[in-house]
A protein has these predicted regions:
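Residue-level marker for the onset of beta-strands and adjacent loop->beta junctions
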Residues: 48, 76, 115, 146, ...
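Carbohydrate-active enzyme catalytic cores, enriched for enzymes
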Residues: 1-87, 141-143
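Short, ordered beta-strand-loop transition motifs
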Residues: 43-46, 138-147, 170-175
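Hydrophobic side chains in beta-strands
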Residues: 54, 63, 80-82, 121, ...
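Acidic, contiguous internal or C-terminal segments within carbohydrate-active enzymes
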Residues: 148-187
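Catalytic core of carbohydrate-active enzymes
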Residues: 59-142
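Catalytic cores of secreted or luminal carbohydrate-active enzymes
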Residues: 11-32, 86, 111-150, 155-158
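A generic beta-sheet turn/junction motif
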Residues: 54, 82, 91, 114, ...
Length: 187
């Protein structure tokens, strides 16, 4: 019988297989200097989060919905840094209090869309709940650019009278620039 079948039938699979593999590599692992990999682009599809950089610029942006764990009403928000320093920021989180986890959480400024870099449309902020979300979210990565598109219109109540609000965030690595373009269609 093959060794892989023995591991599978032993009841210790996959643990013992991983341990044996690591033990067989121990000498190589001990003599290898750890190096932090440099990530120029990351896309977390389930969370609809993009992080893209080129050594100078870094952009992080999110789609998602307004019912996520520790939610803020911030679909379409982003932050930008240049040479490791904030260039365009998002207010972010405040100190957690009992109000943070109560039905009054959206009275707190840092949880409201008004205090994030998303628009207030016709006087309306984004609403909380899973039905308030980014749609038609897309991410494209090439060696020269990273692009995220998110339509944030569904993050707002009907009263905002917005049909489509597509936010396009681009890091152009070749031209060393970031662009944010808004495509807006009102009802």
């Amino acid at each position: 019988s093959k060794p892989s079948m023995l591991f599978l039938q032993s009841g210790n699979w996959p643990t013992i297989g991983i341990e044996l593999m690591l033990l067989s590599m121990l000498h190589k692992l001990q003599s290898t200097k750890p190096v932090q990999p440099r990530t120029t682009d990351a896309w977390l599809a389930n969370s609809q989060i993009m992080v893209a950089g080129n050594g100078k610029w870094l952009i992080a942006a999110k789609g998602g919905n307004n019912a996520e764990s520790h939610n803020h009403n911030d679909v379409g928000s982003f932050i930008i840094t240049y040479n490791g320093k904030p260039a365009l920021i998002d207010l972010g989180r405040d100190t957690y209090t009992s109000q943070t986890f109560s039905n009054r959480r959206y009275e707190m400024m840092n949880n409201r869309s008004k205090y994030h870099n998303v628009p207030v449309i016709n006087g309306y902020e984004q609403k909380d709940g899973s039905e308030y979300k980014g749609i038609d979210v897309d991410h494209t990565y090439t060696d020269s650019a990273s692009v995220m598109l998110v339509d944030i219109a569904k993050a707002y109540p009907k009263e905002a009278e917005v049909k489509s609000w597509v936010r396009r965030l681009t890091l152009n690595r070749k031209l060393n620039k970031i662009s944010i373009v808004e495509y807006i269609v009102m009802d």
